[in-house]
């Protein structure tokens, strides 16, 4: 099963990079709360078809948080955590949009941690598509 999961993740590379480009090209810095909200909803929209209960936690004058749960009675429990905000000010996504150059991805937040978000989403998809239905999954 492990090889099937890795194989699927490799086959998902183009879709994963498309998702990464989508979220990198959204300003979601400390001064772009609406961008953080947009990224949160992209995450929620991705997970909902897989049976996740998605909750958007709003805090006054701060960013939106996503709590996505897919509770299952099995023994396996997986929790993935990350953050959607970057240190880059508004306008950074337009000034330095996502690109791949010499096999490396560039753009605001690629390394911290928008690539981690894309990887998490497609890992969850691969697990569920390959028989991990009894696994309790939580993303925050």
What label would you give each PLM region?
Residues 114, 118-140:
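Acidic/histidine-rich catalytic neighborhood of metal-dependent amide-processing enzymes
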């Amino acid at each position: 099963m492990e090889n099937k999961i890795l194989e699927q993740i490799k086959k998902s590379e183009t879709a994963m990079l498309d998702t990464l480009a989508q979220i990198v090209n959204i300003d979601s810095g400390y001064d772009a709360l609406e961008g953080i909200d947009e990224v949160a909803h992209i995450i929620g929209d991705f997970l909902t078809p897989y049976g996740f209960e998605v909750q958007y936690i709003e805090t006054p004058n701060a960013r939106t948080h996503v709590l996505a749960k897919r509770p299952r009675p099995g023994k396996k429990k997986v929790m993935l955590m990350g953050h959607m905000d970057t240190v880059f000010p508004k306008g950074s996504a337009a000034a330095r949009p996502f690109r791949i150059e010499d096999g490396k991805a560039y753009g605001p937040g690629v390394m911290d941690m928008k690539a981690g978000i894309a990887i998490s989403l497609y890992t969850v998809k691969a697990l569920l598509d390959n028989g991990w239905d009894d696994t309790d999954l939580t993303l925050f």
